[in-house]
Regions:
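Residue-level recognition of pore/gate-forming positions within transmembrane alpha-helices
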Residues: 12, 43, 113, 140, ...
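Membrane-water interface segments at the C-terminal ends of transmembrane alpha-helices
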Residues: 23-30, 71, 137-165, 185
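Hydrophobic alpha-helical transmembrane segments of membrane transport/permease proteins
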Residues: 16-67, 161-173
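Generic alpha-helical transmembrane segments of integral inner-membrane proteins
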Residues: 9, 13-26, 106, 110-118, ...
Length: 271
């Protein structure tokens, strides 16, 4: 197990190295105007632009720039912002936004895990009955409808009938976080419910479940002490992936609800 874990970690490091190098090289292929704001492009002369590029080390040989890039990376020096907040450390710029996205993402992940597993348990317990049909319809709806449409429905229902704020506000964080967290949770709840139902239904067909029923164990004991425990084993592998997707998939949601998180920052960094 240890050997396998170390092997996978090394493979991950190699993958990260290759991706980082590819991104670095692609950034260096961009026109030099990209490194200046619109205001700087209008004011700077060609000599001033050249001097600024030299000061940033962007005129050095590409291998020298790459070595410096990884050296700075190892020292957690991500440089300074040139387009978002000119001259501000990148770590500081990200730090202001990262906390907001992380809080919403982790809260949504926790809620979706609890509600999704609970829904999957009920669907498996009442297989081919009304609750199972409702859960299946919800899963199909969430996966079939574009995110923008489902977000709009949440916005209308939540603001008109429940009175929640339509935009994120730092003055009223708790109330204004409800609708963004709900939107982030929709897909994850459906995913957890689908996985839980699938594995629990598979477990219910095992011979040991039939033996447990013959021994007189109640349906509740069978469901929670045996079926759920065994069904969670293969499902655990999906939890980290789901959390990463929930936390990282907030670009549209943050733009939709004007959340000052990583989403708008990532978007503006490419514009």
């Amino acid at each position: 197990m240890l050997k396998y874990t170390v092997k996978r970690l090394l493979q991950s490091l190699v993958t990260i190295f290759l991706i980082a190098t590819a991104v670095f090289l692609m950034m260096r292929c961009l026109p030099t105007d990209y490194y200046f704001t619109e205001e700087q492009l209008m004011k700077f002369t060609d000599q001033q632009k050249t001097a600024a590029l030299e000061a940033a080390g962007l005129t050095d040989p590409i291998h020298t720039q790459l070595i410096k890039f990884y050296n700075d990376l190892l020292h957690l020096d991500f440089g300074t912002s040139r387009r978002i907040q000119n001259g501000a450390p990148v770590v500081k710029v990200i730090g202001k936004k990262f906390g907001v996205s992380m809080r919403l993402g982790l809260t949504a992940s926790a809620i979706s895990l609890v509600l999704g597993v609970l829904m999957g348990i009920l669907q498996a317990a009442f297989k081919d009955k009304v609750f199972d049909w409702i859960g299946t319809a919800y899963t199909v709806f969430v996966n079939a409808v574009p995110s923008l449409v489902s977000y709009s429905l949440v916005l209308v229902l939540g603001s008109k009938y429940l009175g929640f704020p339509t935009l994120y506000s730092t003055r009223n964080v708790s109330a204004s976080s409800v609708l963004p967290i709900t939107c982030l949770s929709l897909a994850s709840i459906a995913g957890y419910a689908l996985w839980t139902r699938r594995y629990m239904v598979d477990e219910l067909t095992r011979d040991y479940i039939k033996l447990a029923r013959v021994k007189g164990l109640s349906s509740r004991e069978i469901m929670f002490k045996h079926v759920l425990r065994n069904a969670m084993v293969p499902m655990v592998q999906y939890i980290p992936q789901s959390i990463l997707l929930t936390v990282g998939g907030s670009l549209l949601m943050e733009r939709f609800f004007s959340v000052p998180g990583m989403g708008p920052l990532i978007e503006s960094s490419f514009c």
